[in-house]
């Protein structure tokens, strides 16, 4: 990604201190289990290690480390029974979920030959799970439980831990980067309008405002021909251009992409919401004509660029890009009642990483429908198979909500006028999907990603403390 972020995950383990002097062999046993457990965390996150906690004081020290690091998530390994005072001081002042990992070392007891230290050390991780949840509830903390086994391996446990770490990346990205708003939202699309101060207070995402006048001149100082030529080739490698593409044909576009990439790094931008409604003449017209592919080049590098000034869908695109590797702006395009499928897509910038069925294409159109000017239009070709849609909306009090649906993209004819579109079948049927999705009150834009990601989105929502409306799976 152009702007890298790395989630910070607080990790610690707990055990009842009274056991250790009674059964000293538990000390190396627990140290080994905890060391092995930490290896399960992917290297995509920064581990903040709170150690093995057996006293309230150790728990408070772990909490100090977690607060100082501003952790995005806490993962707690239950080694054996422990009282909740080993846990609660570490998380009391945090506003992130606590994932309780109840992973038993042995798959099953050897009933006749199990002594007390063997039971306590290898078979008793489940002893305090309910107690921990009870006290997390009373403390108003969000929580989750993962149960599994070490012996023989447990891919489900590994997958859940990695999924939580992916979800934690979203919080870190929202906190450590900025959103660029260029211009203003499309006039009259009031569902897109947003209070940027409320956005920061609720989601920790800061909005930087930019005028188009600055953007028109952004490429004026880009003169390194080797850099421009390399970026032009990158554009040609990304898109098939109608009528053929050459380095010379996309030279000016490449200059803008290079400039935008540097701007994104300088301003630490991971989200862009833009809309231009001027006269599209002179330098303004030049940039407007090639903005769609230029922003598409940013999207494939992890910068969510949303048209029509839609900040909320930029967030949705970034979430899906972060957890799945692709995030494509979409909206309801049509319903094929004969086939009982929804046609979903959008014009404008898109994510080359979703275009797995065919190389993205680019062509010149005389007019951008509903907008100022004309120029390059890009089309992307999502593959047949599972697809996830994510919309973000707000209630009357400014609280955010996620709206999610999973479906299946099917083969068949699509529109050919240059916009990305896909044929999605939903388990509830096209008619009912449209009713349910609309009744959930989303903005008219949504983000799309290949695969099924509802479970990960639910984790993201728990981390961000946002409700979720699952429309269909």
Model-derived features: where do they sit?
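Periplasmic-binding protein-like
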Residues: 71-80, 99-101, 269-275
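Extended hydrophobic packing segments that form well-structured cores
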Residues: 370-473
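Short beta-strand elements in bilobed, periplasmic/extracellular small-molecule ligand-binding domains
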Residues: 31-55, 142-148, 205-211
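C-terminal catalytic subdomain
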Residues: 296-416
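Short, well-structured alpha-helical segments in soluble
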Residues: 59-71, 88-90, 257-266
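Short, acidic/small-residue loops that bind anionic groups at enzyme active sites
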Residues: 89-116, 120-128, 293-308
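Long, internal scaffold/assembly segments composed of regular secondary structure
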Residues: 231-323
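Cap/lid and interdomain-hinge subdomains that line or gate substrate/regulatory clefts
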Residues: 2, 6-9, 107-232, 236-239
């Amino acid at each position: 990604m152009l702007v890298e972020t790395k989630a910070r995950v607080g990790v610690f383990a707990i055990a009842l201190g009274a056991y250790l002097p009674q059964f000293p062999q538990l000390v190396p046993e627990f140290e080994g289990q905890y060391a092995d457990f930490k290896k399960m965390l992917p290297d995509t996150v920064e581990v903040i290690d709170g150690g093995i906690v057996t006293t309230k004081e150790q728990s408070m020290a772990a909490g100090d480390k977690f607060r100082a690091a501003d952790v995005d998530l806490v993962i707690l390994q239950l080694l054996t029974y422990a009282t909740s005072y080993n846990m609660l001081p570490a998380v009391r002042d945090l506003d992130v979920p606590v994932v309780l990992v109840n992973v038993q070392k042995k798959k099953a007891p050897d009933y006749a030959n199990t002594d007390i230290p063997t039971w306590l050390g290898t078979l008793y991780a489940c002893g305090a799970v309910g107690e921990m949840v009870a006290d997390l509830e009373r403390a108003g903390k969000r929580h989750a439980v993962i149960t599994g086994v070490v012996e023989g391996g447990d891919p489900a446990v590994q997958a859940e831990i990695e999924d939580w770490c992916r979800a934690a990346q979203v919080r870190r990205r929202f906190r450590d980067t900025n959103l660029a708003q260029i211009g203003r939202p499309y006039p009259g699309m009031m569902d897109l309008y947003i209070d940027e101060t409320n956005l920061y207070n609720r989601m920790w995402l800061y909005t930087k405002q930019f005028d188009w006048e600055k953007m028109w001149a952004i490429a004026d100082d880009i003169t390194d021909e080797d850099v421009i030529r390399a970026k032009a080739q990158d554009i040609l490698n990304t898109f098939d251009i109608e009528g053929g593409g050459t380095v010379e044909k996309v030279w000016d576009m490449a200059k803008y992409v290079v400039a935008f990439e540097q701007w994104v790094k300088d301003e630490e931008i991971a989200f862009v919401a833009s809309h231009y409604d001027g006269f599209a003449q002179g330098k303004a017209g030049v940039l407007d004509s090639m903005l769609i592919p230029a922003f598409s080049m940013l999207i494939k590098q992890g910068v969510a660029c949303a048209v029509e000034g839609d900040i909320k869908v930029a967030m949705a695109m970034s979430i899906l890009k972060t957890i799945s590797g692709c995030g494509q702006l979409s909206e309801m395009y049509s319903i094929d009642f004969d086939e009982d499928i929804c046609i979903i897509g959008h014009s404008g910038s898109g994510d080359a990483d979703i275009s797995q069925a065919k190389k993205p294409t680019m062509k010149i159109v005389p007019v951008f429908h509903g907008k100022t000017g004309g120029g390059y239009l890009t089309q992307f070709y999502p593959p047949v198979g599972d697809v996830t849609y994510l919309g973000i909306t707000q209630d009357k009090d400014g609280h955010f909500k996620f709206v999610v649906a999973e479906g299946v993209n099917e083969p068949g004819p699509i529109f050919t006028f240059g916009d990305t579109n896909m044929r999605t079948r939903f388990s509830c049927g096209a008619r009912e999907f449209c009713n349910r999705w609309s009744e959930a009150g989303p903005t008219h834009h949504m983000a799309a990603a290949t695969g099924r990601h509802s479970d990960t989105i639910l984790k993201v929502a728990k981390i961000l403390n946002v409700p979720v409306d699952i429309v269909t799976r």
